[in-house]
């Protein structure tokens, strides 16, 4: 629903969130970057018991305080259930952002945050997070094929998650369908995430009522509805007004974008459809659909 992807209005996004809530979903994840606070704020009027997780690019007290305030104002609450540092990479990035982590821990002690965490595509970061006692939750990229893991294989990430769990850290996965690459075998991919003893929860992007119904049914043990979702592949559109500035290529952690003959070109085999390239584009010519 984000402006980075489908670009839904707050009313359209809220309708999806309320439908999911009515089907029993009680946890939602967003980010400062995604631009979906208005959608969530509207949905919370009819779905008040949602547990809300968000994340932001913050590195010190000032940036963390500003991002937390944006979340409070954005969703209309004075409490965030889970606040995370967005896209952490390693021990070194965690050390470089430690001031923000300490600030968030103080906010938890004051009752403004339920838990502090980090999101990452790196197994090394999952391991490094165990060295920071204020980190209680990790949001790692993990799926059946290991698509999108930046520094190793699925097995490397599983080993890192196992280590984090030994430290009592909660785990909720991202991209169980590998950004859409596993859509042709979506039932097996989702079954892996649901049945894994390493994962406490799974965050799934859903853009339609059918997707919500099929995924909820799968979590209840009925995978039969997944078949009808296989004909909905995702893609990135680069519009004609692309100037070839290269900012999208610089932003892409998957190295899935290059500038060729003055225009951004996407390697779909590497892309995980996160949409972050769209945010980096100064001409607003990239969209995930």
Residue positions per predicted region:
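Conserved, mostly hydrophobic/aromatic
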Residues: 28, 40, 52, 71, ...
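Short catalytic-loop micro-motif centered on adjacent basic/acidic residues
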Residues: 26-31, 53-54, 114-117, 173-174, ...
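Glycine/proline-rich, positively charged
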Residues: 4-7, 18, 22, 59-172, ...
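Conserved short secondary-structure transition element at the edge of the structured enzyme core
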Residues: 21-22, 105-108, 132, 166-227, ...
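Active-site mouth loops of central-metabolism enzymes
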Residues: 1-11, 53-62, 182-184
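N-terminal binding-site loop/beta-alpha segment at the start of enzyme catalytic domains
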Residues: 1-50
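Short hydrophobic/aromatic-enriched beta-strand-loop microsegments
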Residues: 49-54, 135-143, 222-229
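Ferredoxin-like iron-sulfur electron-transfer modules
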Residues: 226-244, 255-273, 287-289
């Amino acid at each position: 629903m984000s402006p980075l992807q489908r670009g839904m209005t707050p009313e359209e996004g809220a309708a999806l969130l309320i439908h999911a809530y009515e089907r029993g979903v009680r946890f939602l994840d967003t980010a400062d970057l995604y631009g979906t606070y208005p959608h969530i704020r509207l949905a919370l009027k009819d779905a008040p018991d949602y547990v809300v997780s968000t994340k932001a690019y913050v590195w010190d007290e000032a940036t963390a305080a500003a991002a937390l305030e944006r979340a409070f104002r954005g969703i209309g609450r004075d409490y965030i259930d889970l606040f995370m540092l967005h896209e952490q990479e390693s021990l070194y990035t965690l050390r470089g952002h430690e001031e923000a982590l300490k600030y968030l821990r103080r906010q938890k002690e004051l009752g403004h945050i339920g838990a502090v965490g980090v999101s990452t595509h790196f197994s090394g970061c999952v391991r490094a997070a165990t060295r920071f006692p204020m980190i209680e939750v990790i949001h790692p990229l993990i799926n059946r094929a290991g698509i999108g893991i930046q520094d190793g294989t699925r097995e490397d990430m599983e080993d890192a998650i196992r280590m984090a769990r030994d430290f009592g850290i909660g785990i909720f996965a991202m991209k169980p369908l590998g950004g859409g690459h596993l859509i042709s075998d979506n039932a097996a991919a989702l079954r892996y995430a649901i049945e894994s003893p390493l994962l406490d929860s799974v965050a799934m992007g859903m853009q339609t009522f059918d997707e919500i119904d099929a995924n909820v049914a799968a979590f209840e043990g009925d995978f039969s509805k997944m078949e009808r979702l296989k004909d909905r592949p995702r893609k990135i559109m680069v519009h004609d007004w692309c100037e070839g500035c290269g900012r999208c290529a610089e932003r892409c952690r998957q190295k899935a974008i290059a500038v060729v003959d003055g225009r951004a070109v996407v390697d779909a085999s590497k892309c995980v459809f996160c949409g972050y390239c769209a945010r980096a584009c100064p001409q607003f010519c990239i969209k995930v659909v």
